[in-house]
Amino acid sequence: MRLPEISIWKVILLLHLFALQEFQLVSAANLPSLSSSTKAADSSSKGSSSAKTTTSLGKSSVTSKDVSSSHNVTSSTKMPKITTSASTSLYTNSSLWSNNSVISTSSITPSSVYIPVTDGNKFLYQAHHPNGTVFIAFAGCLGAILLSLTGAWIALNIKSWRSARKENKLRNLENQYQHDPFYFQTNINDDESETSSHSDDSDISEKVLKNNSSRMSLYTLGSTSVLNLLNNKTDANDNFRSSMFISPTEILQSDANNSNTWSQSNESAIYDSLSSTPREPGATQILGKFTDSTNPFNYTSYNLSPDSEDRSTPKSNVSQGKVKKYRPPSVHLDQLLDGKE
């Protein structure tokens, strides 16, 4: 569907017709018509403009007379006359009265705010504290806490250092006096140099003890090196009995292998010199010296054996040529061994 072509002139003509109809409606309502004119600020140019319109509709007519350039609005009707005037003064107020109508204009000039001086004013509070008091107090508390922690850390380190130094001295004394220099074939100075290399250790236990090639055995106190060190010649039987440890099975096992060791060695060579370091005698060597009469484990000499009434077992052993050097302390073990034989 094709729309009809409308020219611009037709549109303008329709707009004029609508404006004319509105003007006629206003005139029919007996409303005043307003006309305004502007006057230039220059005093040399005094141009004026006037407009005169006349319309007739039926029997009523409205005529607008001349309107000058002084912002005057006139009408033939009995409407009030409104006159406005503007002044360039900053502190002037103007009001005009015309037929019970008032229009007033006002103007305000901006001004700067005056701040009074606080020096010497008794009505104002004067602050005497320095700026940043809260931050200064917080920093002081934090510094006190850090300083106390640092002091406690230093005190604990000094205390631990003193305790470690004291333990090191005790360890040196232990290595110097509790070891047998003749048995271990080492000097005291070597022990001190060895312990000084481990001065960083705080306990006296494992590292120093593990570095030694050998330690004191159960029979060290009964060894001949201790006798040489103390320069005291005591009986081997007393040295053996000074130990509280008794192992019958160990005695029986080592007796078979080392039965002739004590007889081959010279007993006087043990006590010959203090400078020599003889080998520590074994338990079988000490016990091999004992006879049946002096053996502390021979319970038959004290009539403590339950088979003391029955002399068949010892007699049979003597008759067979199997004479025991000693008897074990356990009667039950003795019966088991006799049963095996």
From Swiss-Prot:
Full protein name: Chitin synthase 3 complex protein CSI2
PANTHER family: CHITIN SYNTHASE 3 COMPLEX PROTEIN CSI2-RELATED (PTHR36089:SF1)
UniProt organism field: Saccharomyces cerevisiae (strain ATCC 204508 / S288c)
Top-level taxonomy: Eukaryota, Fungi, Dikarya, Ascomycota, Saccharomycotina
Function: Appears to be a structural component of the chitin synthase 3 complex.
Positions with biased composition (Low complexity): 35-70
GO CC, any one term: fungal-type vacuole
Positions of region (Disordered): 35-78, 272-291, 298-341
